[in-house]
Amino acid sequence: VYAISVALIGPLMRIITLKVHAHRLLPILVAIFIISNIVGMLAPNFNVLLLSRLMSATMHAPFFGVCMSVAATVASPAKKTQAIALVQAGLTIAVMLGVPFGSFLGGFANWRVVFGFMIVLAIITMLGMIKFVPNVSLSAEANISKELTVFKNPHILIVIAIIVFGYSGVFTTYTFMEPMIRDFSPFKIVGLTVCLFMFGLGGVIGNLITGNVPENKLTKNLYLTFLLLFLTIVLFVTVIQNSILALTICFLFGFGTFGTTPLLNSKIILSAKEAPLLASTLAASIFNVANFLGAIIGSILLSVGLPYIQITMISGGIIVLGMFLNLVNQLYEKKHVTFNEYS
């Protein structure tokens, strides 16, 4: 529910707020997140808890989209892809620390404590946004009709297809990562936490490495990260039965997962020069479409009785489709795209 809400509401929320300056909009979006988590922490029933997640979903895509736009705007032309990747690195570090800690905390304390912890962190974030976000003019010449042309750009549509049809394979496996580790590895709660930490650590390193890839080499490097994802996913169930190999493959899975996202984010944002504001939010939204589809595909496969090892094989097949679409993208770029002089 959260992922599809982000995908559907995110672009609409960004269109509504196009004229709001980034240094004002970002604290407002974080405030929405704080309120949603207060509602979640105090929720008397599941319906109210679900409502809190929907509230939180309204700010997800615009928040990361605006952050990436600000980073790309203040960076020099030669450093734009690196700036976008650094924003993604913040998210990756949050995953590295937050997911295992949340899992650990949830195993020993009331789930409402987790919401309270997120509220405290969000308040600190909001204060930081108010203090440090520069007053850059992202929205001075914002034009809704011009921004909507992003949906007519063939290059962007191809990249969107790569994310939707390729990256959903990643989420098909990622959805069941924790239960697979519990069922097939020798680890218990602490070991599971370490595995999730290794996934996040791999994500941070992968993000930082691919964040330095210049614009004209993004497409070629996508083949490498997709290949790494394919291999780690199809071997995941077999490899995690050994403690050392389990930690290694969790690291590689994180490396491939978060090493791919800055490449795709940069491709969408840098390809949408006619619609920079909506494109950055669209990138965050499309990843959540892939998240939603991957979870649905995985759930359907599990419900019909397929074992985890077959689900990971199907995930690998979906990633191969993403690699094929990347080939289509490469052929399109050879004919129609001229990369800037700084690449």
Sequence positions of predicted segments:
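Conserved MFS/SLC helix-loop-helix module at the cytosolic interface between two early adjacent transmembrane helices
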Residues: 8-44
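Helix-to-loop junctions at the C-terminal end of transmembrane segments
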Residues: 9-21, 206-218, 302-303
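Paired small-residue
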Residues: 36-39, 47-56, 244-252
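Helix-loop-helix hairpin linking two adjacent transmembrane segments in secondary transporters
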Residues: 48, 77-78, 82-131, 176, ...
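Cytoplasmic helix-loop-helix junction between adjacent transmembrane helices
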Residues: 52-90
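Intracellular juxtamembrane helix-capping segments at the cytosolic ends
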Residues: 63-75, 259-272
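C-terminal transmembrane helical hairpin of 12-TM major facilitator-type secondary transporters
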Residues: 220-264
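A late C-terminal transmembrane helix in Major Facilitator Superfamily
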Residues: 270-306, 315
